[in-house]
């Protein structure tokens, strides 16, 4: 479970146009954090509709891992189209590979998301084989083929 503080912009004015929305959003967050609801079914289908609404050009995902830039961590660089649920999909794959995240640097340039993860597995850098498997699964997930 990743928990952080995010600021969001309500471009569609959902909260302003729906008087009960604030309570609904808080209830939904409580359901997910407590484990009573899963995030994936809630996000399913929304990413595509948001991208279509914005008329966004697709940014081809690029995933790169590096064991040379840091003495303690494998550095994972990801560039992809900014989309609803992107960080969730990335963190799910990282978790499925048994990796721990020590630091995440996130940036958005227009519709391009640039995320850098400092990761380990069992408190050591990933092996070459582990890096290949992780980057392959991330690439497939971001391309929608996995």
Kindly give the residue locations of the regions a language model identified.
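Non-catalytic interaction/regulatory segments
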Residues: 1-146
